[in-house]
């Protein structure tokens, strides 16, 4: 029976269809001026950029010039790249310009589509960021599409790992900047740890187009970017506790794979307590006593490392390091580390060198970073399954762009077997059968372990003509994937490895030319060889088409339908034929965790024999329902985490905005004076209770406070004894004494130095307290869930206590700044005797592994540090600097006239 909604959609079209049709008048208008645009010379076409900018300066909007701007980009693409955007690509460009996500199938030219809104929005002069998932794609797209932008008189920059601040600043200053999501986030955090505005590399967040938007804003949404500093070395403790886990038996612990949790049973707890007691590590009588919180954290991490984390699935060991594998792409994530000691527990398990734990200095999630942009858009081949999340969290609609040619791919029903062995046997038979026909095959697996197991079984069949693409061979990724469309090619790939690189039937022309003719100079010989490659690829493509196109075989379903759809989408690009099929077994993770027992009994009743498969649309629907449940649960988790992170994010905005104001100010004397006044008011309020008699005042406490905070030894006890003295009188005398002392000091320092000292101390103190605040919030968040047992809402409790902590931070800031400024003095520093250079090691961030130093409270050092090891933003890394040396901060002044002019005492 057809539903009313189905009838309505047939009559009026879906909301997606109506939205796409709404762009048709603009497409028609762009096509109507195509011939006129083609008639322009190269110089006239490039001059359009100046003309458009003049129109914007006169008050026109970007929407007003969209039609001629898109026409200009289309023509520039045709002349420079030999590629003319189709009408549906124009629609995709308009969707991106309208703050939405364009869902475009694989091979539909997302990279080219982006040039249209990128050029249009770059005309504003505020910069456009094009975000990719890795450095390779950022460099590739910037190099290719940068030719179009350059032809039209625009500049293109690219941000990749390892660039200097100067190079980053120049890249961000370009009209268009290509970068990875990680680099953008880290540059934002690093900028907000700088001490001079001219040292910041980013210039605002105007418009970002995120390629593979589902990967970055959904899969990576929960991943915080963290810049951190090292804590004390506790590697011995990790090794000691790691040795206990293999002594446990299954009854000593409980594992919940669905929730990814591991806990000790009563028997296991008793066994651990005995072991810890013997080692002298247990305080008190029981493991879960409050004084053993740190030990509990260690043993829980060790248990998870052994029982939840699987080598070659969750991580691999490479070059004596534990390297995380992205569960969605199967790619290695070198440098990225699990936080809160989990990575160290894995290092202990694998008997590799244990890296020190880290303390968070600055952090932000991708959810909050990308929500800072004034305008945000995205592209992907698979977004509809996450449309609700994009709408709720990012306020982004998902609009499906029609393909230029109809999709001819055949998506077959899943085949379900009883066991792994039966499934793998069927897969191998299917692979070899397709190979005999000359059909290219892409086999998708969910882990390195599975891909290598399949490869081994193929070799046992006497067949080794295939490529394995997983995290171990990341460097060859793009080329292997690009050649997966050659007739008879067999490519085994983990999940979505190679995403961003098209699989073209017959092979990738550009990559073959680069690989085979990279050293051949331009000329007749090169041209002839290029023509030969073109003819060869044309012939190979026809053979692949005759064999049925690319055949995608999936070895199991992923938790997310979107990942499965991405794998299917590698086949059938641009109207090519293709085929896809999923092979499953009841021993697969998804089937095992989400109720394969019922299905097993059902298959038994049906009389399913060994080696036989069941194929039915009902099976597909049942699996999709299981996947939807997992997706809904993961969305709820991300949504809930965002509510907590929003609390920190609001506070982060306040602190970072305050830092920016401080950096932009040359004189903050009024702010410092207000801080001092408020500190004095707090002191008086604390030691002189309201409506109390003079003899009830805490004169001794007030005197001590004045000495400790204001650095003033005042006769407070004598003042209290005066006849008729009041609270206001005490406050006024303290204020006058403090102001007089500070004014005298400012006159001795001179205005320039005093203003510099004030700003430096306020910023450094703010940074120090903010880092402590992040640690406090992390701790609060880790325990706040227990409030639920007392029938209290953990989120509301967290908001309330986080606000109290932030209020305390501001109070502590006022007090610490006042105390330091009342004590700071100019000193003459004599040159120190030379000492061995300090070897400054870069520390690894626990979640991202970025090399980062963090500014610290300035302290005098007696160690000589070689200039290349000094971080301009962190005085703590400078060591002893000669008075006549150039100041390491980068100001260009001599040290004695810059940072060396003052020292906190």
From Swiss-Prot:
One GO term describing the cellular component: cell envelope Sec protein transport complex
Entry keywords, A to Z: ATP-binding, Cell inner membrane, Cell membrane, Cytoplasm, Membrane, Metal-binding, Nucleotide-binding, Protein transport, Translocase, Translocation, Transport, Zinc
Membrane-protein topology: Peripheral membrane protein
Record-level GO BP terms: intracellular protein transmembrane transport; protein import; protein targeting; protein transport by the Sec complex
EC number: 7.4.2.8
Disulfide links within the chain: none
Binding site for Zn(2+): 887, 889, 898-899
Chief place of localization: membrane
InterPro entries: Helicase_ATP-bd (IPR014001), P-loop_NTPase (IPR027417), Rhodanese-like_dom (IPR001763), SEC_C_motif (IPR004027), SecA (IPR000185), SecA_CS (IPR020937), SecA_DEAD (IPR011115), SecA_motor_DEAD (IPR014018)
Keyword set includes Ligase: no
Ligand binding (ATP): 89, 107-111, 502
General function of this protein: Part of the Sec protein translocase complex. Interacts with the SecYEG preprotein conducting channel. Has a central role in coupling the hydrolysis of ATP to the transfer of proteins into and across the cell membrane, serving both as a receptor for the preprotein-SecB complex and as an ATP-driven molecular motor driving the stepwise translocation of polypeptide chains across the membrane.
Family membership noted in the UniProt record: Belongs to the SecA family.
SUBUNIT field: Monomer and homodimer. Part of the essential Sec protein translocation apparatus which comprises SecA, SecYEG and auxiliary proteins SecDF-YajC and YidC.
Listed name of the protein: Protein translocase subunit SecA
